[in-house]
């Protein structure tokens, strides 16, 4: 979500800025932990990883407060939409820009991410389809169960299996 959207309150904008900040810190701290391990500094890597974990908790709390954590099916719909945008628009544009600026390192990074986004879209879409099928089957089963019920002769308000 863009934080420059005019209909956001200051608090909503601040929540989004905090979410982005926590996500960036998480990524950086994990990257720094990997570098510390490469340099033979596991104790420093552990510090980076512990703080990265705390940043995750902060970010998740901000997401919750911002109302972004919904039902699993809604979350799957949200991420498939996001992955579709990344795969279809964001990364292709970034690749073109990097090519125009002769930044092969960025082209490679964006291209790899684009391929992974395709995979992410596939697995999220599959999970969404499976959940929708399960919910449809569950709904049909509930309807079928109700259709197979008849009113008890003793009381019109009590259902019994036929």
Residue ranges and their predicted role:
Residues 1-162:
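Non-heme di-metal
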């Amino acid at each position: 979500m863009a934080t420059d959207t005019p209909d956001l309150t200051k608090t909503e904008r601040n929540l989004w800025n905090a979410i982005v900040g926590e996500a960036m810190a998480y990524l950086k701290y994990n990257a720094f932990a990997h570098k510390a391990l490469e340099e033979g500094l596991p104790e420093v890597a552990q510090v980076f990883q512990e703080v990265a974990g705390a940043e995750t908790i902060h970010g998740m709390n901000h997401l919750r407060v911002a109302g972004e954590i919904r039902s699993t099916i809604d979350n799957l719909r949200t991420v498939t939409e996001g992955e579709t945008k990344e795969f279809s628009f964001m990364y292709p544009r970034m690749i073109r820009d990097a090519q125009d600026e002769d930044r092969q390192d960025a082209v490679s990074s964006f291209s790899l991410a684009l391929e992974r986004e395709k995979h992410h879209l596939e697995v999220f879409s599959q999970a969404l389809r499976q959940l929708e099928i399960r919910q449809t089957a569950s709904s049909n089963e509930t309807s079928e169960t109700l259709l197979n019920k008849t009113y008890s002769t003793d009381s019109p308000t009590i259902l019994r299996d036929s």
